[in-house]
Swiss-Prot record:
InterPro entries: BRICHOS_dom, Chondromodulin/Tenomodulin. Disulfide bonds join 131-193, 283-287, 284-324, 294-318, 298-314. GO terms for biological process: cartilage development; cell differentiation; negative regulation of angiogenesis; negative regulation of endothelial cell proliferation. This is Leukocyte cell-derived chemotaxin 1. After cleavage, the post-translationally modified ChM-I is secreted as a glycoprotein. Nasal and articular cartilage, and fetal epiphysis.
């Protein structure tokens, strides 16, 4: 069976029909250049925005400076140590409850940080291989106002501070082993010490002073014993006095020896806290004017302890002590 199919002839396309087969042509678009006025407007907006940001930053910095100005204050002074003039500075940071004292410069610089918040004092000497800490009473430093700063400046600036350096005063000797756990130290003390090993300072007195103190304690004990013997036997107390059952003994009230407490009484010594300072360690009770108080920081000699000198390599760390009358009147704002 034969299938018949109709053949459709292909139409010939002439030259006139080429434009119908060609792809559509894209019309040319003319880009209109930006006008100068538009560019000026954009530039003006950018400049105004930058000026506003700068103004806001300046205002913020001003208020930040004004706020921190009441918490931190620096003052510079001059001190005479062994006939040699040295520069010193004191920084009061009431916001962080810190005092920082610097003495000397270069290889003779000594820095002392009093952390009243945690009750720790850190001391470091330039070129030294150790950093030292000692116990410090906890206190609160009030804010320093503008009038107070002017008063401090008039009290210290441009004057040579007298130095009190008593030969019979206590001497601070470093411990034999460094502190293993320094987590109790503040960031300021850790920043002061850096990578140096930290050693506790233990107070000691010259042997002559210790001998005098032992003699005084021996006399007190002898006098107390004599009075007890005169009061009669223990079973028959004198009239008006309680018996031993109600009267506490001295040994019962005495605290046990604590080798980690640098302020503990040892060998009949009194408390090592400087009696010229008040209980907060900020000012001087008996002083009528400011002075520079220096203390000796020494290294252990490692020899026989009863030897007259069991320390070596002493260096001095000095700080300014203000009269308590001035401190209370000015710092606390009572006048």
């Amino acid at each position: 069976m034969t299938e018949n199919s109709d053949k459709v002839p292909i139409a010939l396309v002439g030259p006139d029909d080429v434009e119908f087969c060609s792809p559509p042509a894209y019309a040319a678009v003319t880009v209109k250049p930006s006008s100068p006025a538009r560019l000026l407007k954009v530039g003006a907006v950018v400049l105004i925005s930058g000026a506003v940001l700068l103004l806001l930053g300046a205002i913020g910095a001003f208020y930040f400076w004004k706020g921190s100005d009441n918490h931190i204050y620096n003052v510079h002074y001059t001190m005479s140590i062994n006939g040699k003039l040295q520069d010193g500075s004191m920084e009061i940071d009431a916001g962080n409850n810190l005092e920082t004292f610097k003495m000397g410069s270069g290889a003779e610089e000594a820095v002392e940080v009093n952390d009243f918040q945690n009750g720790i004092t850190g001391i470091r000497f330039a070129g030294g291989e150790k950093c030292y800490i000692k116990a410090q009473v906890k206190a609160r430093i009030p804010e320093v106002g503008t009038m107070t700063k002017q008063s401090i400046s008039s009290e210290l600036e441009g004057k040579i501070m007298p130095v009190k350096y008593e030969e019979n005063s206590l001497i601070w000797v470093a411990g034999d082993q460094p502190v293993k756990d320094n987590s109790f130290l503040s960031s300021k003390v850790l920043e002061l010490c850096g990578d140096l090993p930290i050693f506790w300072l233990k107070p000691t007195y010259p042997k002559e002073i210790q001998r005098e103190r032992r003699e005084l304690v021996r006399k007190i004990v002898t006098t107390t014993t004599t009075r007890r013997l005169r009061s009669g036997p223990q079973g028959t107390p004198a009239p008006g006095r309680p018996n031993n059952g109600t009267r506490p003994s001295v040994q019962e009230d005495a605290e046990p020896f604590n080798p980690d407490n640098p302020y503990h009484q040892q060998e009949g010594e009194s408390m090592t806290f400087d009696p010229r300072l008040d209980h907060e360690g900020i000012c001087c009770i008996e002083c009528r004017r400011s002075y520079t108080h220096c203390q000796k920081i020494c290294e252990p000699l490692g020899g026989y302890h009863p030897w007259p000198y069991n320390y070596q390599g002493c260096r001095s760390a000095c700080r300014v002590i203000m009269p308590c009358s001035w401190w209370v009147a000015r710092i606390l704002g009572m006048v």
